[in-house]
Amino acid sequence: MAYVRLTSLAVLFFLAASVMKTEGGLPTCGETCTLGTCYVPDCSCSWPICMKNHIIAANAKTVNEHRLLCTSHEDCFKKGTGNYCASFPDSNIHFGWCFHAESEGYLLKDFMNMSKDDLKMPLESTN
């Protein structure tokens, strides 16, 4: 009986180790680009089909291959596709993805409307 338990444990470890480095899901999103737009979440148009964003970034050789690829925040500003370049969690992907970080914009706008007196913090001593 102990051999059956050890055998099933060995099979479990073998299967877990074999799927550790695989990416889940298909690279395509299951639709074609309609007027350059994909309607599936986490997908973008890579003509003629919609592909997952991380697949587009992994296959790209330069930032200019897709309008949302970036290496810095400045790339997003220059392309006009956002104000924040977020990197993918996979370290093998050398490009990031441009986003519109609205909260950052609102914070900057609120900061610019503040007077200089608001920025000075009073020093209070508590004993």
Swiss-Prot record:
Its main location: secreted. It comes from the Eukaryota. The keyword Secreted applies. It is found in: Secreted. There is a cross-link at residues 25-53 (Cyclopeptide (Gly-Asn)). Keywords: Cytolysis, Disulfide bond, Hemolysis, Knottin, Oxidation, Plant defense, Secreted, Signal. The modification Methionine sulfoxide is found at residue 51. Pfam families: Albumin_I_a, Cyclotide. Residues 54-127 form a propeptide. Belongs to the cyclotide family. Moebius subfamily. The presence of a 'disulfide through disulfide knot' structurally defines this protein as a knottin. Displays an unusual domain structure in comparison to other known cyclotides as the cyclotide is followed by a C-terminal albumin-like region. This is Cyclotide cter-M. It comes from Clitoria ternatea (Butterfly pea). The lineage of its organism: Eukaryota, Viridiplantae, Streptophyta, Embryophyta, Tracheophyta.
